[in-house]
Amino acid sequence: MEGDGVPWGSEPVSGPGPGGGGGMIRELCRGFGRYRRYLGRLRQNLRETQKFFRDIKCSHNHTCLSSLTGGGGAERGPAGDVAETGLQAGQLSCISFPPKEEKYLQQIVDCLPCILILGQDCNVKCQLLNLLLGVQVLPTTKLGSEESCKLRRLRFTYGTQTRVSLALPGQYELVHTLVAHQGNWETIPEEDLEVQENNEDAAHVLAELEVTMHHALLQEVDVVVAPCQGLRPTVDVLGDLVNDFLPVITYALHKDELSERDEQELQEIRKYFSFPVFFFKVPKLGSEIIDSSTKRMESERSLLYRQLIDLGYLSSSHWNCGAPGQDTKAQSMLVEQSEKLRHLSTFSHQVLQTRLVDAAKALNLVHCHCLDIFINQAFDMQRDLQITPKRLEYTRKKENELYESLMNIANRKQEEMKDMIVETLNTMKEELLDDATNMEFKDVIVPENGEPVGTREIKCCIRQIQELIISRLNQAVANKLISSVDYLRESFVGTLERCLQSLEKSQDVSVHITSNYLKQILNAAYHVEVTFHSGSSVTRMLWEQIKQIIQRITWVSPPAITLEWKRKVAQEAIESLSASKLAKSICSQFRTRLNSSHEAFAASLRQLEAGHSGRLEKTEDLWLRVRKDHAPRLARLSLESRSLQDVLLHRKPKLGQELGRGQYGVVYLCDNWGGHFPCALKSVVPPDEKHWNDLALEFHYMRSLPKHERLVDLHGSVIDYNYGGGSSIAVLLIMERLHRDLYTGLKAGLTLETRLQIALDVVEGIRFLHSQGLVHRDIKLKNVLLDKQNRAKITDLGFCKPEAMMSGSIVGTPIHMAPELFTGKYDNSVDVYAFGILFWYICSGSVKLPEAFERCASKDHLWNNVRRGARPERLPVFDEECWQLMEACWDGDPLKRPLLGIVQPMLQGIMDRLCKSNSEQPNRGLDDST
């Protein structure tokens, strides 16, 4: 309901009090408005981040569903049936928004700021509100004793007209007639501010008085005056408030010291909350502004100051007047001079900035963590795509070698096996006879008095003697045969098993089953145990021979089963064995089992290969999505969150003199930013989405790199949404500023020793990039910067990418580009090639183009010549070893280029030799260009 009082205008009216200047209100409005703008950007980034993770989850679930339902029509088997599901589950499920961080960030973007006024009593709280608004809106006369005070919670918010109403916080307005509704008023009537003692309505007691005003400050932030302690404890008020608001807490003081009750209240606030507090000593009504230099003021201030230090709100290292410090974290302030209420804008800025910086940092950590996972997975997927086919081929080759070796053994060792069987029989004969003599028959009742038994019992006894001889003989022959091929089993089977284990790594359970089955076949095939089953030719041969013995023995008369009889049966069975036939049979069976196992192995390997083929196809698809969609999209969000953090901490940099222009940006001088001096600022306006993504990934790689003395430092980034008068969005990259680039240095003239040291510095920088998995792809004169001591640093990582994230795009500077760059299939050896060209310039001491390149009329002409083998010419000043190093580096075959770990000591040796010899014999090989 509207009151009849005169409404405040859009411009706040400055009251007579010492704190109510329009300047302070403008500063507060500017600070809270800035917070709202940056909070909006944070909210937008969080919303897009949540959408990104939802899209990843949907993609994961969709792929899993299509895999389980057999979509796509791909060939499936035990190895590939659920391989796609396993692939996605293993590589996408770990990419998710951590619930704790998401909840924290969502709470921050949902909470708008408010100024909360606490104080020693209700009068001083009302007085501070009037000072803040610059108008006398609340009565400052005594509302009653502090113990009997019933001031309800007050909320001041923006509206086009002045309006006073009762409402439950965050719920609905109460229908209640207020005194303010009944006539004109200058200050809100005391009756409306207090909870009436005789009112038993719980809703009425909990309700807050909501005042809407047309006021500049309230357009940006609500102001809440806490109820008196007797009505509701401050801790409870804060607890309700922090769920929906970010409180900027002010504490109004009017006494020279804190009472015991004040200290208890502040201790509880500090115990349950971590918010800083702005303590302000409100001047007494009607008093003049007290000279801050008086000793009385100093002593009073120091008493409050000491109390707040004891309570942990202030630190002895911070000046209590509220002057802003260098800390990024907001600190509590004590302002005892009423004319310095303007420091509230500094305090609120610190509180709001701390909140935003912490949130931006937390969000950026989520981005960077998931981005690193993407990049690591890209490496794993790329390696999987490269190594799995090689492993399968290696497994097939090694198994075939093992099969042929064992087959050769079976073919050529028949005579050896015959001799081995004869030797084994001779060695074991007595042992076998003794074992047969002492043998206890199963399922045959032998009369103890030596009476003859029937033919059936005789046959059973002879069969058991036969089985004993066969089992013992088989075991002995097998042991000797195994020892003859054991070295093959160790060298081949062990290697094969290790290779199979690598093939099953990171695969689904179904692939594990296939690989385990394959290993079982492998062990069964090559663990050479020569056992003769009842259907084998060896057993049939032995059985025929022993049947003849039975016929000779049994058809005369049924014998008595005595020790002598058992020995005689065993003797005749052993003597009737043919070693040559037995050897031939063993080798034949060995070959049969080898063939069978070899075929089973090959079939199972084909099955595994089919499973891997389907899996690798899915891996390649996922690898492409990671490189072209997931990682760039997340990198852009990461760039935005990090740039928000940087602009909050260090503000937007000021552009100085233009230093140079490149293909995608302009480089400016920047005197000072973020504590770094001097700086270079590269302003990049990405023309399209692809360039945005490339820039974002470049920024991530640069920020992820540890600092290195051979790389130019990147200090930070800021996104300028109003670049060029608001016509475009630019990314401002703030970097270390160096003296000049190598191109300029060579034109000015550098000594031989300096040039060779620069070459060593460049190699060291490239080696570091390669050690981090990165490929620069654009090593050239202008991308090597020199400091004042002419030590080199590599810059412009615009084309720099991890090998696994390279799409095969043609990038770089034509004369420094390796031939394989044009095919789209290349690795970090392209940097070795580019260094070879750079080294040509370094050794020449000039920036003049090589003749082979200078004759080219166009880039296409140059590229065609490079592909056909055109290289820089040898200059007369070149040292032989330098020329050989150049030629090796720019070799057309990437595999023949030297590793930089070999190039570096070679360069050091060249430098030691030439520079030492130059001091004695000038101009020996290379000009000393000065």
From Swiss-Prot:
CDD domains per UniProt: PKc_Dusty
Entries under PROSITE patterns matching the protein: PROTEIN_KINASE_ATP (PS00107), PROTEIN_KINASE_DOM (PS50011), PROTEIN_KINASE_ST (PS00108)
Listed EC numbers: 2.7.12.1
Coiled coil: 190-216, 396-432
Residues that, per the record, bind ATP: L659, G660, R661, G662, Q663, Y664, G665, V666, V667, K682
Signal sequence annotation: none
Residues at the active site: D778
Pfam families: Pkinase
Domain Protein kinase span(s) in chain numbering: 653-907
Disordered as annotated region, ranges: 1-22
Protein localization: Cytoplasm; Cell membrane; Apical cell membrane; Basolateral cell membrane
UniProtKB keywords: ATP-binding, Cell junction, Cell membrane, Coiled coil, Cytoplasm, Kinase, Membrane, Nucleotide-binding, Serine/threonine-protein kinase, Transferase, Tyrosine-protein kinase
Ranges of Low complexity composition bias in the record: 1-14
SMART domains on file: S_TKc (SM00220)
GO BP terms: cellular response to fibroblast growth factor stimulus; negative regulation of apoptotic process; positive regulation of ERK1 and ERK2 cascade; positive regulation of fibroblast growth factor receptor signaling pathway; positive regulation of kinase activity
Record-linked InterPro entries: Dual_SerThr-Tyr_Kinase (IPR051302), Kinase-like_dom_sf (IPR011009), Prot_kinase_dom (IPR000719), Protein_kinase_ATP_BS (IPR017441), Ser/Thr_kinase_AS (IPR008271)
A GO MF label: protein serine kinase activity
Catalytic activities: L-seryl-[protein] + ATP = O-phospho-L-seryl-[protein] + ADP + H(+); L-threonyl-[protein] + ATP = O-phospho-L-threonyl-[protein] + ADP + H(+); L-tyrosyl-[protein] + ATP = O-phospho-L-tyrosyl-[protein] + ADP + H(+)
Entry's family note: Belongs to the protein kinase superfamily. Ser/Thr protein kinase family.
Name the UniProt record assigns to this protein: Dual serine/threonine and tyrosine protein kinase
Lineage: Eukaryota, Metazoa, Chordata, Craniata, Vertebrata
Encoding gene (name): DSTYK
